[in-house]
Curated annotation (Swiss-Prot):
Keywords recorded for this protein, A-Z: Ribonucleoprotein, Ribosomal protein
Superkingdom assignment: Bacteria
Entry's family note: Belongs to the bacterial ribosomal protein bS21 family.
MF-aspect GO terms: structural constituent of ribosome
Pfam families given in the database record: Ribosomal_S21
Protein name: Small ribosomal subunit protein bS21
BP-aspect Gene Ontology terms: translation
HAMAP family cross-referenced by the UniProt entry: Ribosomal_bS21
Recorded name of the encoding gene: rpsU
Example of a GO cellular component annotation carried by this entry: ribosome
Lineage: Bacteria, Pseudomonadati, Aquificota, Aquificia, Aquificales
Length: 67
């Protein structure tokens, strides 16, 4: 959990900037997005395979355009 201690007389903008930096440093938002929807391992595998095929097809199309 991220905690930021506010000093007396410190501008709120500075505190927010420090808070955002700590959240980013601890990768809280990326972890939250990753865990937002559970994806079973089988789905992850299928998704990786689809992306791999898409990438290969894209490379082939690009290569054929150059010829």
């Amino acid at each position: 959990m991220v905690t930021v201690i506010v000093q007396e007389g410190e501008p709120i903008e500075k505190v927010l900037k420090r808070f955002k930096a700590r959240v980013e440093q601890e990768q809280i938002l990326t972890e939250l997005k990753r865990r937002e929807y559970y994806e079973p391992p089988s789905e992850r595998k299928k998704k990786r395979e689809r992306n791999r095929r898409k990438k290969i097809l894209k490379a082939l199309k690009k290569q054929q355009q150059l010829i």
